[in-house]
């Protein structure tokens, strides 16, 4: 499975065939292959790639040993991607946006914006209660566990709490255009997270592929 890491730049729009298409621009790569994992040593085939160089003082000793073994500069982010054949990659090899093409379907993984402690109307779209006619119930969640039966709160009950800052995957997004010179990739629609947030881009897992006879 091919993939790359990037950072969300922001949203804009492009025009194709007299249609305005909302796109999110991501600065993707270049990433560096830091480690290769094989079935013999690790039980599966994968490559570990790194993104965004950092000064040595910002990497701890175990990570510095990991980077020195691969003979690469310290990197802020490390992620794994399963591959069929690790021999197609070399330690220190650079991976850029050219692994994707315009019109291709991809999956985007990021952390959604954190919105803090939120009530049920904002977090779960509860309707709420009456605002007039003597009602004292406005934005509350209502009954949580009843009294005699079941006399408990069921697991998974929608209640107030931390909203956002969760791993979100957007599937089957379309690559609208690629700027190889500036390492930019524009995808149709929105991407989870704030500007500057880390985004993992991989080939679509559930993309429709032509049937083979």
Curated annotation (Swiss-Prot):
Alphabetical keyword list: Ribonucleoprotein, Ribosomal protein, RNA-binding, rRNA-binding
Xref: PROSITE patterns: RIBOSOMAL_L3 (PS00474)
Source organism, top-level taxon: Bacteria
InterPro entries: Ribosomal_uL3, Ribosomal_uL3_bac/org-type, Ribosomal_uL3_CS, Transl_B-barrel_sf
Entries under Pfam families matching the protein: Ribosomal_L3 (PF00297)
Entry's Gene Ontology cellular component terms: cytosolic large ribosomal subunit
Any one GO BP annotation for this protein: translation
UniProt GO MF annotations: rRNA binding; structural constituent of ribosome
Xref: SUPFAM superfamilies: Translation proteins (SSF50447)
Purpose: One of the primary rRNA binding proteins, it binds directly near the 3'-end of the 23S rRNA, where it nucleates assembly of the 50S subunit.
HAMAP family in the record: Ribosomal_uL3_B
Quaternary assembly: Part of the 50S ribosomal subunit. Forms a cluster with proteins L14 and L19.
Homology family: Belongs to the universal ribosomal protein uL3 family.
Record-given protein name: Large ribosomal subunit protein uL3
Naturally occurring in which organism (per UniProt): Petrotoga mobilis (strain DSM 10674 / SJ95)
